[in-house]
From Swiss-Prot:
Location, primary (coarse class): cytoplasm
Location(s) in or outside the cell: Cytoplasm
Residue stretches making up the Obg domain: 1-159
A Pfam family recorded for this sequence: GTP1_OBG
Name the UniProt record assigns to this protein: GTPase Obg
Encoding gene per record: obg
Enzyme class: hydrolase
Keywords: Cytoplasm, GTP-binding, Hydrolase, Magnesium, Metal-binding, Nucleotide-binding
Organism, scientific name: Shewanella piezotolerans (strain WP3 / JCM 13877)
Oligomeric and partner information: Monomer.
One Gene Ontology term, aspect cellular component: cytoplasm
Amino acid sequence: MKFVDEATIRVEAGNGGSGCVSFRREKYVPDGGPDGGDGGDGGSVYLQADENLNTLITYQFERFHNAERGKNGRGRDCTGHGGEDLVLKVPVGTRAVDAETEETLGDLTTHGQKMLVAKGGFHGLGNTRFKSSTNRAPRQKTLGTDGEVRSLRLELMLLADVGLLGMPNAGKSTFIRSVSKAKPKVADYPFTTLVPNLGVVNPRPGQSFVIADIPGLIEGAADGAGLGVQFLKHLERCRVLLHILDIEPIDGSNPVDSARAIVGELEKHSPKLAGKPRWLVINKADLMLEEELQEKIDKVVEELAWDGEVFTISAYNREGTAELALKLLDFIDTLPPEEEVDVEAEVEFKWDNYHQNANESVNEDYDDDLDDDDYDDDDYDVEVIYQR
């Protein structure tokens, strides 16, 4: 199935049902009181993470999604049926962004996690709600409110502990093949990897971590060169980044310039991503003599002013890859657990105080219509004449 990591959809929650104005009509009860029921709440729209999905391709073709409208209230104090909620299944790791305001609504990072993205409209109130000692035959009701309407941009970001960075043909796919059972395509031309790949690494029995390989970056990627930086978002949830550097490029380019270009593109795209722990991994060590190799590595580290971890491997021959995997596992274990955010608790909607405001408004309007000079005991009873 085609890998699609971004889609724009429009979600519309159901409108609330309106309240009803109704009075009891029974034999031997000539002046029945109000019995208009409330409407039903409109259905809301939720996103739910599903570990069985791995692409957003469905939402490229199904862009409009509507929840059910609440039913109107009816006589005899019958409340309208609430609209059914709409639950949209998305892959684990999906982020929801409001396409109009660019506000991030939340991330779905665990299987079964739900997030409210469009709240259904509130139900309207029937005239039974407005009866009082001075208003025995109310003819007021409130309408149901409109449901939330949003344009959402869904962004799928892979969940991985370790992310791979590097120029095309630096050996990223070969490395992930050497430490896991993932089998991404490997060839002797640039941009062999066109979509992100995941692999599970098991350095010790019962202990593992996930590693992500993304297409190679080139200078100018932040401005759209090559495949651009559209796949860098998949590294945002990684705990540590491995900068894979080809020590002996086939085109004769300078490894230092390549490394600086990658760091520059990273900082342009996201300072937060550039600030993550980053290890330098010198690859293709088997292409040079040991004496020349160490001399060149020292020169690269010095020119880059690199003060972090440095590892030398040959992904093709699997030299040094097992030791690097163990180091990564131990480092990840020392990192603090990531905090989980309750995305639903932070969402605010504009209709939260609708009913309270509606009641206050009706009561104020009714009180203003009362005239103290004309007020007498007969005003406590209201005669209602029904005509068929």
